[in-house]
Amino acid sequence: MHSPEVLLENSDAVYDYYLRHQQNRWKALGGYAILARRFRPRVAFVDGAKQQLKALIRSGRPVVYAINHLSNSDPYTVAATAWYSPLRSKIGRVRVLAKDELFIDPDQRRKVDMMGGIPVFRGRDHGIRAVNAAGQRMMDICAQRLAAGDHLAVFPEGTCNHVDPTKVQPVGSGIGHIAFRAAKLNAPPALVALAMSYGPQPDPTVEPTAEEAVSARFVFREPVLELPQRPGDIARLVKEELQLAVDGAVARY
């Protein structure tokens, strides 16, 4: 299957491709294992969350993971965390929303595709009106992938937090619309908040380097099995759950 160039003006072909795209699971497992050895995250769970997550994954129900965003290393440290968690069994069936610029360089695109990337054309990069149709299509594709049994990882803050790494930035309604649309396809997802801390940052405007991202603390919250009915309410719940996860990651660093 030909992989189209990831450009906004080509978004229909891009999302047709990523609706059907499937990672090579063995390559994905190898890639995640390498990242796990490189970044060595310290993974923790709130009381009962690990067993609940294991049971949720065994059930086959789709899951949306909401993750805070601190640096450009985050997709790789999150992949390393998946290796050291019950998510290892889902490697190859987890989709990750990633900004479109990560798909420009061919070598980087291969890595992002290996990790299950789905491109996002952001309003801050292209203009809100320009990305509206592509954004609607992206949310539909995510809902369809969830309905097909995939899991979905989202950085719902939308950009790296260069303000205060201990406080979750505003969360847009996109994650709520994805969950809402998946429910309309008879695949209501569960929500799991996953937060990272790279330790104290004297200057939050300077994001952690890849070296500083080694041995980050990650904390999983317990799954939320019943989500609100409206996208905006789902987004508010996401922010609340993610802040609790961030508090835990900072406290346990």
Question: What is the predicted role of each segment?
Answer:
Residues 17, 57-130:
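Catalytic core of membrane glycerolipid acyltransferases/transacylases, capturing the structured
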Residues 19-42, 105-115, 209-211:
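Alpha-helical membrane-targeting segments
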Residues 35-62:
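A short, well-structured juxtamembrane/interface segment
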Residues 60-62, 92, 148-150, 187-188:
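Short coil/turn segments at beta-strand junctions that form active-site/ligand-binding loops
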Residues 109-110, 151, 158-233:
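A cross-family acyltransferase "interaction/gating" segment
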Residues 130-138:
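Glycine-rich anion/phosphate-binding loops
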Residues 141-147:
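Short amphipathic alpha-helices and their capping/turn segments at secondary-structure boundaries
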Residues 223, 228-253:
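A cross-taxonomic marker for long C-terminal extensions/tails that follow the last structured domain
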